[in-house]
């Protein structure tokens, strides 16, 4: 058995929060007695035991009021801790600790539980485990060996709940159910019942599902059989198709061979025609070339090639020289470019150097100006005139440096003087602050002590004030107590509880009648649910019928227009399949015709491509000839241009001859006029009248003579150019003839042929398009019909299923014949709701009356509690009057100490005031000193910084001036100017070289142009000989192709092709028929497979078997649940009967041995069957009540017994329950058991408790804990041999509870 050994309490209710206030109590065996006045903290010990074992707070407390109040403790956080040491049911030592914290936040407090700790001794070592509250509660229940309900309601029952056995019926039932642990089993029974109901509902659903699954299984089997039949037919059809294909394959191969040979014949014919056309073209081209050539070379090919190669070598040599001159020109150009770049770079450098020279002069002027200004500022002599030389500049820098050092020394001296004065002033300030701080600290400490003493004095005065009126208060309490007792007596007389109970009984009868009506309606609902299932199945079938009708309508609506347009009517499946077969035959015939037209179109397009290529070649040749003629002539009027050119050549030749003779004529005329004494005009023989006129004529002739060479040269150049152009035009004359033939004859002929063949191709294309359109139309119609075929098949299946559904609907309609369908489920449900509403109203009225009864009972109880509270306050005031003298002495002592502290604080404050004024004065003096120091130092420093800044600028300018001279920038500038002049001279020489090379290149180009004219003539001779050779090869190739074509037996091949094609067409027709049948079988197989893949047929047999297994196993499970439900219910009832008999026996014995009056023989607990339980619950539940037996009559004790009888009955019932249910835990705590008992019953209770202890003392772990304020009751218990010590609970001077261990022998002296 489990046993508690000791417990420590800290920070709970009135128990202090300091470690010194921790209270420890050790529990004795078999009896522990706790004595103390009201409010001392006795009940707190029971509350701590209950909390440490169950985790439940006292009634009306959520934890905040359970912990010591932070406002009373003058703390923000208050921690509470309870520790319990016990032995569990196995005798092992266990230590348990629970902690709490309460935090003051503004006006509200916040409560929180901390992690608990359980410590066990294992193998001689302590093992601690931190757990959460819920886990610790389970551990404690396991360790003590009793349930939480027994701990709360029996072992550690709170004083406020101690009378629960006589509480209201519903609350009493909950308590007893928890103690009996019946709640869990009742819940288990309810769960079993719900599971059984749900499973029964599932079985009904399974039956409906199985019915449909069976239909689906049979339908799936039928579809599977049809599928196998179609697959066999498909295999036979595939064999037939393969046989036809094996016959077609060699025919196709032979037809392909013949087709290739015929294509080859067509290709050979086209090639022969192309070669003949090419031969004619080549012959004409050769003839045109011979006519164009001025001279046809008569030598051998080797001689012609030798001359051509020699001529090419001469041209290449001249071109090489031209390239050399070009390279020389390129080198000269590159050199000129390089020199120009260097010239540009030198010009840029010259500009940059000139800019630096200008800056240098500006720096010198700026520096001298700054030196002159600063020298005047510093009053330095010798620096009035600029410019300054190097010596003057150095002398100036030295003088300025000395002046700077002098000014800086003066500024530092000022800074040091002020710093010394500042340090002295700071020391005075520190001394004053130390004195002031010491006095303030003294005042603060004494003020704090004064505040504490004031608080203590206030508390003492408050207690004295409370005690002032204690005597008067005792008299008032006596009067209030008498008044309250009279009021209690009047209330008990005025209560009309019996009338209210009678009204409740009448309403309960009405409730029972309504309950029977509701059960009757439930039975009617259950009966209607059976027919509802049949109705539901019939509704489902009707819905299925409507769905199938809608599907058939949709299919017809979707395809009616299309099929009517194709066939002229809406067909069935067989009619549609026949139409598809005929349509496939039309498509095959059209495709064969299309193939023939395509072959003819390909041949025509090949011929067109050949003619197009030939036309393109001729047009390109014509364009090339026109371009060459235009390049030479400048227009397309070749003959007119040639005639004009010949006239121009004759005119230019005459002009050249005239100019060539003019030189000799003018020379002779000038010689004659110069040498003769009397010259005359050489033309008219006129003598010149004067020398001046003669000289004018001579000058005019000399002037013309000087112009003759240039004009002669120009005329010769013009003549050569025109002759060259004439040669070029003569070379183009054969080309001109060829161009005319191309434009007038060959190109028009080819274009006419192209027009003819284009018309033929267009005709063939139209035919092909027509056949393709026809095929597309046939194919579209076929696809449309095929798309409809699946829906037509589906529609036929829907029609079959529709007939099956209509048959089932007729069967269900037969089943429902004779059933009254006027009263619907909704009507019955509505009537049930009305009855249920009335039932709820009656139940509400009953609860309202019970509440009134309870209110009256509570009013009586409140008055009784008021009587108890007044009695307790009276006892408390009596005990407090004994502390009055001690509080008066403490008042005098605190008053004296406070007067002394006030005097000392006043003296310290008087010393503090002059110190504060002196401290402020010193701080002001220090601040003024700092301001003067900062001002003086700033003025001196600004003067020094100004000089430094100006010297810095002068030094920077001097540095730049010196750097310019040191870098030699002036000499470098002169050097670059010299280099620029030299570069300009080299650039002029390079330009002269370029002019020379250019003249030589012009001469070489003229020679090359002359050589190329001769080269063209040789090239034409070579071209002519190559064309003749090519013409021979073309003729040989044409004869070869004619020979090859004659060996191919074209007529025999065409006859064989026609015969094989007819045979192939026959086989193809049979093949198409076989394929059509095969396609029909495949469509059927696909449709059957698709149906089998549908959700209702997929694995239909497996689903049926599985659902059947589930239903059978569920039915077996329902039977097992019924058996288990009945067995568990019977076991609960039997256990309940045994325990109630055992409890009532103990209650009777304890009552007879304890109660001293003769009005009640004994009491017992009666458990009556609950009349409100409906038949649908199928089990009994109990309502509990405590009755008292008077003679042969059993009366409810609740409302009929006195307060003392109520307390005694509740105590005895708790003792009986502890005896019955605490087999593993011998602990029982009684809080104020003598409340409301008279002296005789107190004595008998003490005797009964001693007897119980005596009977249980043989159990080592039996522990009875008694808490009381009645010391006479303790003395009665102490007369037994089981009590040697007891605990006295009281409050110390800090109003914190203390637990003091006392001997029983000291009790008598304390009482008396």
From Swiss-Prot:
Component of the MRN complex, which plays a central role in double-strand break (DSB) repair, DNA recombination, maintenance of telomere integrity and meiosis. The MRN complex is involved in the repair of DNA double-strand breaks (DSBs) via homologous recombination (HR), an error-free mechanism which primarily occurs during S and G2 phases. The complex (1) mediates the end resection of damaged DNA, which generates proper single-stranded DNA, a key initial steps in HR, and is (2) required for the recruitment of other repair factors and efficient activation of ATM and ATR upon DNA damage. It is found in: Nucleus; Chromosome, Telomere; Chromosome. One of its GO terms (molecular function) is single-stranded telomeric DNA binding. Its EC number is 3.6.-.-. It comes from Xenopus laevis. Residues 203-342, 415-558, 587-628, 712-1070 form a coiled coil. The gene is rad50.L. It comes from the Eukaryota. Pfam families: AAA_23, Rad50_zn_hook, SbcC_Walker_B. Mg(2+) binds at residues 43, 159. ATP binds at residues 13, 38-39, 41-44, 67, 69, 159. This is DNA repair protein RAD50.L.
């Amino acid at each position: 058995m489990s046993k508690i050994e000791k417990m420590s309490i800290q920070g709970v209710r009135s128990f202090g929060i300091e470690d010194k206030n921790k209270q420890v109590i050790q529990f004795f065996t078999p009896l522990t007695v706790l004595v103390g006045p009201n409010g001392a903290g006795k009940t707190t010990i029971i509350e701590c035991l209950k909390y440490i074992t169950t985790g439940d707070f006292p009634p009306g407390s959520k934890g905040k009021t359970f912990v010591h109040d932070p406002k009373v403790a003058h703390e923000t956080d208050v921690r509470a801790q309870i520790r319990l040491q016990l032995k569990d049911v196995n005798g092992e030592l266990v230590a348990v600790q629970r902690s709490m914290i309460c935090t003051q936040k503004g006006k509200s407090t916040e409560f929180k539980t901390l992690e608990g700790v359980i410590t066990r001794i294992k193998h001689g070592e302590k093992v601690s485990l931190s757990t959460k509250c819920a886990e610790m509660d389970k551990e404690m229940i396991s360790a003590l060996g009793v349930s939480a309900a027994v701990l709360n309601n029996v072992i550690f029952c709170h004083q406020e709940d101690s009378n629960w056995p006589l509480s209201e019926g519903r609350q009493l039932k909950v308590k007893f159910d928890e103690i009996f642990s019946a709640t869990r089993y009742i819940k288990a029974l309810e769960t079993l019942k719900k599971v059984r109901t749900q499973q029964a509902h599932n079985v009904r659903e399974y039956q409906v599902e199985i019915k449909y699954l069976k239909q689906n299984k049979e339908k799936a089997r039928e579809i599977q059989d049809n599928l196998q039949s179609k697959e066999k037919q498909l295999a036979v059809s595939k064999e037939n198709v393969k046989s036809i294909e094996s016959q077609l394959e060699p025919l196709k191969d032979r037809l392909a061979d013949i087709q290739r040979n015929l294509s080859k014949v067509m290709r050979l014919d086209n090639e022969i025609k192309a070669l003949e056309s090419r031969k004619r073209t080549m012959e004409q081209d050769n003839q045109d070339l011979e006519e164009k050539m001025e001279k046809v070379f008569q030598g051998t090919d080797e001689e012609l090639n030798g001359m051509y190669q020699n001529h090419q070598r001469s041209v290449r040599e001249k071109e090489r020289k031209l390239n050399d001159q070009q390279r020389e020109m390129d080198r000269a150009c590159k050199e000129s470019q390089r020199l120009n770049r260097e010239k540009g770079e030198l010009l840029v450098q010259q500009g940059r150097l000139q800019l630096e020279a200008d800056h240098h002069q500006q720096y010198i002027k700026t520096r001298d100006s700054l030196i002159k200004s600063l020298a005047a500022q510093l009053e330095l002599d010798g620096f009035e005139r600029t410019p300054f030389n190097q010596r003057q500049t150095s002398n100036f820098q030295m003088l300025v440096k000395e002046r700077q050092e002098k000014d800086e020394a003066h500024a530092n001296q000022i800074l040091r003087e002020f710093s010394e004065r500042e340090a002295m002033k700071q020391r005075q300030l520190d001394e004053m602050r130390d004195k002031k701080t010491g006095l303030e600290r003294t005042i603060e400490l004494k003020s704090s002590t004064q505040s504490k003493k004031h608080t203590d004095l206030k508390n003492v005065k408050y207690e004295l004030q409370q005690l002032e009126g204690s005597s008067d208060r005792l008299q008032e309490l006596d009067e209030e107590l008498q008044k309250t007792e009279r009021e209690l007596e009047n209330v008990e007389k005025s209560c009309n509880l019996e009338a209210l109970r009678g009204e409740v009984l009448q309403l309960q009868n009405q409730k029972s009648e309504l309950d029977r009506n509701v059960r009757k309606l439930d039975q009617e609902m259950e009966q209607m649910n059976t027919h509802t299932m049949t109705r539901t199945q019939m509704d489902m079938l009707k819905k299925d019928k409507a769905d199938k009708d809608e599907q058939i309508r949709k299919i017809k609506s979707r395809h009616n227009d299309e099929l009517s347009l194709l066939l002229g009517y809406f067909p069935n499946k067989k009619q549609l399949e026949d139409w598809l077969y005929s349509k496939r035959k039309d498509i095959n015939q059209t495709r064969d015709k299309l193939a023939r037209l395509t072959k003819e179109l390909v041949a025509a397009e090949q011929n067109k491509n050949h003619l197009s290529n030939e036309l393109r070649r001729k047009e390109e040749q014509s364009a090339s000839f026109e371009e060459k003629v235009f390049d030479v002539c400048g227009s397309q009027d070749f003959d007119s241009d040639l005639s004009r050119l010949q006239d121009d050549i004759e005119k230019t030749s005459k002009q050249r001859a005239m100019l060539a003779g003019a030189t000799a004529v003018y020379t002779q005329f000038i010689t004659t006029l110069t040498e003769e004494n009397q010259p005359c005009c050489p033309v008219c023989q006129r003598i010149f009248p004067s020398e001046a006129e003669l000289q004018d004529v001579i000058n005019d002739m000399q002037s013309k003579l000087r112009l003759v060479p240039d004009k002669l040269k120009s005329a010769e150049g013009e003549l050569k150019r025109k002759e060259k152009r004439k040669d070029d035009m003569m070379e183009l004359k054969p080309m001109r003839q060829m161009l005319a033939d191309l434009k007038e004859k060959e190109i028009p002929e080819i274009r006419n042929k192209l027009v003819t063949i284009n018309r033929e191709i267009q005709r063939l294309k139209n035919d092909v398009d027509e056949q393709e359109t026809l095929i597309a139309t046939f194919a579209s119609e076929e696809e449309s019909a095929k798309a409809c075929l699946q829906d037509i098949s589906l529609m036929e299946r829907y029609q079959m299923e529709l007939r099956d559904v209509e048959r089932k609907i007729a069967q269900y309609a037969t089943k429902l014949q004779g059933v009254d369908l006027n009263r619907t489920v909704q009507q019955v449900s509505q009537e049930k709701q009305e009855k249920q509403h009335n039932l709820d109203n009656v139940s509400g009225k009953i609860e309202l009356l019970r509440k009134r009864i309870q209110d009256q009972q509570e009013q009586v109880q409140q008055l009784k509690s008021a009587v108890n509270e007044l009695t307790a306050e009276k006892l408390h005031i009596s005990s407090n009057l004994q502390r009055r003298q001690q509080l008066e002495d403490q008042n005098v002592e605190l008053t004296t100490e406070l007067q002394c502290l006030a005097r000392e604080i006043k003296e310290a404050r008087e010393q503090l005031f002059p110190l504060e004024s002196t401290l402020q004065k010193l701080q002001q003096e220090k601040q003024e000193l700092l301001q003067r120091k900062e001002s003086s130092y700033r003025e001196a420093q600004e003067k020094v910084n100004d000089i430094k800044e100006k010297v810095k600028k002068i030094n920077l300018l001097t540095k730049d001036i010196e750097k310019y001279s040191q870098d030699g920038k002036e000499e470098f500038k002169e050097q670059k100017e010299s280099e620029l002049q030299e570069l300009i001279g080299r650039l002029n020489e390079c330009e002269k070289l370029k002019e020379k090379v250019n003249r030589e290149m012009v001469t070489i180009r003229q020679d090359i142009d002359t050589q190329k004219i001769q080269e063209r003539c040789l090239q034409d001779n070579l071209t002519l000989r190559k064309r003749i050779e090519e013409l021979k090869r073309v003729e040989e190739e044409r004869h070869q192709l004619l020979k090859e074509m004659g060996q191919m037996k074209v007529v025999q091949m065409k006859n064989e092709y026609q015969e094989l094609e007819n045979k192939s067409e026959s086989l193809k027709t049979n093949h198409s028929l076989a394929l059509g049948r095969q396609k029909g079988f495949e469509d059927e197989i696909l449709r059957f497979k698709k149906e089998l893949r549908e959700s209702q047929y997929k694995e239909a047999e497996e689903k049926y078997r599985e659902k059947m297994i589930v239903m059978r196993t569920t039915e077996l499970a329902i039977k097992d649940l019924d058996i288990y439900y009945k067995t568990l219910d019977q076991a609960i009832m039997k256990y309940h009967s045994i325990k109630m008999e055992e409890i009532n026996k103990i209650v009777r014995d304890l009552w007879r041995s304890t109660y001293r009056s003769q009005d009640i023989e004994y009491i017992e607990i009666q458990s009556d069957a609950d009349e409100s339980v409906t038949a649908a619950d199928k089990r009994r539940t109990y309502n509990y009540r405590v009755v008292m037996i008077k003679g042969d009559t059993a009366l409810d004790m609740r409302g009929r017994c006195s307060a003392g009888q109520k307390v005694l009955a509740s105590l005895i019932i708790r003792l009986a329950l502890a005896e019955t249910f605490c087999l593993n835990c011998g602990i029982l705590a009684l809080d104020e058991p003598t409340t409301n008992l008279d002296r005789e019953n107190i004595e008998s209770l003490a005797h009964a408790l001693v007897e119980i202890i005596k009977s249980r003392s043989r159990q080592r772990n039996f522990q009875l804990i008694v808490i009381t304020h009645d010391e006479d009751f303790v003395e009665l218990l102490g007369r037994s041999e089981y009590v040697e010590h007891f605990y006295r609970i009281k409050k110390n001077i800090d109003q914190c509870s203390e637990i003091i261990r006392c001997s029983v022998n000291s009790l008598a002296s304390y009482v008396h």
